Swiss-Prot record:
The lineage of its organism: Bacteria, Pseudomonadati, Pseudomonadota, Gammaproteobacteria, Enterobacterales. Gene3D superfamilies: P-loop containing nucleotide triphosphate hydrolases (3.40.50.300). Disruption phenotype: Loss of ACNase activity. Keywords: Endonuclease, Hydrolase, Nuclease. It is an enzyme of class 3 (hydrolase). InterPro entries: P-loop_NTPase. Its EC number is 3.1.-.-. Anticodon endonuclease (ACNase) that triggers the cleavage ligation of tRNA(Lys). It is activated by T4 stp protein and masked by the prrD protein (the endonuclease subunit of EcoprrI). The prr locus restricts phage T4 mutants lacking polynucleotide kinase or RNA ligase; T4 mutants lacking these genes manifest a T4-induced anticodon nuclease (ACNase). It is thought that Stp and other T4-encoded ACNase factors counteract the masking agents, thus activating the latent ACNase. One of its GO terms (molecular function) is endonuclease activity. SUPFAM superfamilies: P-loop containing nucleoside triphosphate hydrolases. This is Anticodon nuclease. It comes from the Bacteria. It comes from Escherichia coli. Coiled coil: none annotated.
Length: 396
């Protein structure tokens, strides 16, 4: 049965009951893990989940008594540090084309950005933002902050005291910069909270912080820089010695795999959405090559339809797509070469017909029993003959 994103947010922040087998199966409570790593395809609801999780923490804070609204807002802000698409929306370009003024990247003023930028300014972190940004972008492309950290201009340093100004970043470079701002703050959070004695910390701004929620950072990076970013993030998380919890969502198999292999003490999930508007958060074992690649998503979707006796005509299209991806990976020139030899022509015609059935006014939505059996036959043939790994069922 599906859940709402608010219910999944509650699941992520609550110790879970798991079954263990000693001499007999017993139920135990698993504490909220240090790292929860979530894979989901684009459009599933990752960003909405990060928003619902933030709202969940706010509702817990607002249950308190004896605090006015401003105090509650400050407390909720300090309980979670988050990065998502809404974080990027807090930055915008000021382009004065008529006056040919230098483009400026400006920050939307609100309680969150005021808190964040004031901390970075007070901690003297502008040089670290520049360093992180140049690592993932261009080592000559240099940000310049105004005194309040509310406006940023960019120049290209030539190395001979020459500077090319009037530079506006590409969308990818802009995402890199915003991530660098967040990562710089996160680095300070981990470093400061690693000081066990609160009285000895450089600032008390993070004393109430419980969670860091990171949703799909810098999806515009090439693979090499994405791997570097994931390794750096994993290293920072591993260096955290406090009780801080991390939740990371991504649609990138590469980013997921690096974090999966680099991090210990993690619990991994796949987030799925259903047509009725509900969601499922399913615990997974193994990296994305075993659990999350798109071809495996296709296979699992078809398997579920077969198990539920809910095969529809579009499942033939998914099946053909699965055959095509498997054939491409194995080096076959045609996907039809993977079909059973004795029925290849017949089955190929069926898949081609049903894949293009939208062109026919006579096509009905419900496949015949024979067509449903064909889907199962073809899927079983592919699984049994192309070496698909079968995940074993595990207890917690």
């Amino acid at each position: 049965m599906g859940k709402t994103l608010s219910e999944i947010a509650q699941q992520l922040s609550t110790p879970q009951k798991v079954k263990k087998t000693v001499h007999k199966e017993v139920e135990a409570t698993r504490a909220v893990p240090k790292v929860q790593l979530i894979y989901a395809f684009n459009g599933t609801g990752k960003t909405r989940l990060s928003r619902d999780f933030k709202q969940l923490l706010e509702s817990k804070v607002h249950d308190g008594e004896g605090e006015d609204e401003a105090e509650q807002s400050a407390l909720s802000r300090k309980k979670i540090l988050y990065y998502n698409a809404f974080t990027e929306d807090l930055f915008y370009w000021d382009n004065d084309l008529q006056e040919d003024a230098e483009p400026k990247l400006k920050v939307q003023p609100n309680s969150y950005t005021n808190w964040l930028l004031t901390l970075l300014k007070d901690l003297g972190q502008d040089s670290n933002i520049v360093r992180y940004f140049q690592r993932y972008a261009n080592d000559k492309l240099t940000p310049h902050f105004n005194p309040d950290f509310t406006e940023i201009t960019f120049s290209m340093e030539r190395g001979n005291d020459e500077r090319s100004a009037h530079i506006k970043l590409s969308k990818g470079e802009e995402s890199n910069f915003i991530w660098s701002v967040f990562y710089t703050l996160l680095d300070q959070v981990v470093t400061i909270l690693n000081v066990a004695d609160p009285d000895a910390r450089e600032t008390h701004a993070f004393d109430q912080l419980k969670y860091v929620f990171i949703d799909d950072p810098v999806s515009s990076l090439d693979d090499n820089h994405l791997i570097e970013l994931a390794v750096n993030l994993a290293g920072l998380i591993k260096s955290s010695e406090s009780d801080l919890k991390f939740i990371i969502t991504t649609h990138s198999p590469i980013f997921y795999n690096v974090l999966f292999n680099e991090l210990n003490g993690k619990v991994c999930y796949m987030l799925e959405s259903f047509e009725d508007g509900t969601f499922a958060l399913t615990e997974k074992y193994g990296d994305s090559n075993k659990s999350f690649s798109y071809h495996l998503h296709l296979k699992q979707t078809i398997e579920q339809a077969i198990a539920d006796n809910n095969v529809e005509r579009y499942h033939f299209t998914l099946l053909r797509n699965l055959y095509e991806k498997t054939a491409s990976f194995l080096g076959y020139p045609k996907w039809s070469e993977l079909l059973p030899d004795d029925k290849q022509l017949y089955l190929s015609r069926i898949i081609n017909f049903t894949s293009h059935s939208t062109l026919s006014n006579e096509a009905v939505a419900e496949p015949t029993p024979a067509e449903k059996a064909t889907v199962k036959l073809l899927l079983d043939h592919l699984k049994n003959n192309c070496g698909f790994w079968q995940q074993e069922q595990k207890n917690g």
